Each structure stands twice: as C-alpha cells, then as structure tokens.
Amino acid sequence: MALAAASILFAPAQQQQKVIGFMTDFDVKDDAVGICKAVMDGVAPGVRVIDITHQSEPYNIAMGARFLAGSAPYFPKDAVFVVVIDPGVGSTRKAIIARSRVGQTFVLPDNGLLTLVQDRDGIVEAHEITNPAWMIGSGISSTFHGRDIFSPAGAHAARGDDWTQAGSVLDVSKLVRLDLHNATINTTGLHGQVIGTDGPFGNLVLNVPAETFAQLGYKLDDEVPIDLAGKHYAFPFVKTFSDVPVGKELFYIDSRGRLSLGINQRNFSETYKVGEGADLTIPKK
C-alpha cells in the first residue's frame, strides 16, 4: 500500500542527541515499556523518547507498518525509531538498523514493519545488529529483544554513534516486505479492503487513497453504494461526522487521506461486525 510522499518533516533536532520515536505492542499494564526506556536512558542519558503507541494490536505487523509510516513524517529528519512488534522474537529473523533517504533511522525486526516507509521514502542502507557493543551485554533474552537489542541499539544511534558499526551490511532489496497494496479499479468498479479500525471509535480504515476514490466520480453529499463483507449498503459521502445526524453512517476522507467509513458518535465496526481484512467493492458512479 503506497503512501503519499512525506512533506511534513521537521528540521533536525537542535540538541546533540536525536529524538527517539518508540512504538510497541507491549501495552502499558506491566513494566516492559518502562524498562526499555530506562535502557535507552542508560545508554544515552537524557535522550528524548516520544511514545508513538504501545497499544498496536499484538503481533499485527501490518498495523505497525501503517502506524510507523503514518507517524514518521511528523518527526525530525534525523529521528531514530525503535519499533518492537515482533512475533518472531528469538527466531532466525534479523534485528536490523536502517536509514531512509529522508535521513531517519529505524531499529526494528526485519519482519515487514518497514514496508510502507520503504515504499514512500526509500531505504538507502541497512545493517543487521550483531555487534555486542550495541546490545545490553551478555545474557541476551530469547523473548525480550525490545530490552536487550532494539532499545540499546536505538539509543546508541540517537546519541550519535556510528550506526554502520552495529553489524554487517544487508541488501536492502532483500528486506522482508509485507504484501500491502491499495485498492484497484477495473470495469466493475473499485475493489479494496478494510485495513484497520480507527482506535476506540470503530471507524473502518480502507485501503482507498482519496485520489483513487475520486476516480469513481462521486462528489460530496452523494450516496455511495458499497458491497462490504458480502452485504450491500449505501452511505453518504461527506466532509465530517457532524454532516450527518448522530447514529447515521458516513463515508469521509480521514486525516491520512484515505477513504473511511464511520457512524457519527457510534462504533461502525461493532455495529456491523466488520473489521480488518473485510473485502469491499464500490461501483463507478
């Protein structure tokens, strides 16, 4: 799924240490996130860590890839990202550090989390993290690489250490990629998919960029028919939730420039029992 070119990138951080964007699926009910941040501070005292989220759906690499690509443009051009959504922890999957064409650095498992960043920004160089000096030390856990590998490596990069010393160079064309794609249009209309829900609100996020939806010919206030998860509906296309009464459905373009489905002050996903992975078709007008 391609994303629009990043255009919101801020200037490099003014302090010597770089900002770290930290994202996991750990939740915050136990001490895992705090431990990782303590490790970062131990390597790079006073480092500024911005929590992107720690409630990405467990094991959902595609969701993590979407959150990472969506948040990266709002960080400095020299920011470091530590991302731990790692169902393959302790296996043969690689721990990597990579640099985008923009200049941002990513420390994460090689499991597809970089797919959308690579599509939009390009990855110019990547290394496997094998240098013990970039890890927590001896006794690396087989189940907590967030603490033992990714956090210290990210902190080393943030404090300005030469990130190419983290380990052996990798062929960026062979980094693991997810099969993420945008909706397609043919003679019968648009064919797409639900790629997630919008936090606790239950709005459906679709793999339909605004410019793709525009090709169907619908205008604001049009009723848009849709076959969703095998059932047929029609909802108005409007600018925002308040354009329809409370409890009524709507199509709208979300803050990331994607077509979405919602209900004003209600949860669409729960109401219609539809979630990530559901197929959809929208005919041309």
Positions of the model-derived regions?
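Bacterial Sec-dependent signal peptides at the C-terminal "C-region" and cleavage site
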Residues: L3-Q16
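Active-site histidine-anchored catalytic micro-motif
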Residues: Q17-V19, D31, V43-V49, Y59-R66, ...
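N-terminal signal-anchor module of multipass membrane proteins
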Residues: G21-V28
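Short, solvent-exposed amphipathic alpha-helices that sit
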Residues: A32-M40
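A short aromatic-anchored loop/beta-hairpin motif
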Residues: D51-T53
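Anionic-ligand-binding alpha/beta catalytic cores of soluble enzymes and soluble regulatory domains
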Residues: G139-P209, A214-Y218
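A conserved acidic, glycine/proline-rich C-terminal tail/linker
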Residues: V205-T271
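Pepsin/retropepsin-fold aspartyl endopeptidases
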Residues: Q265-K285
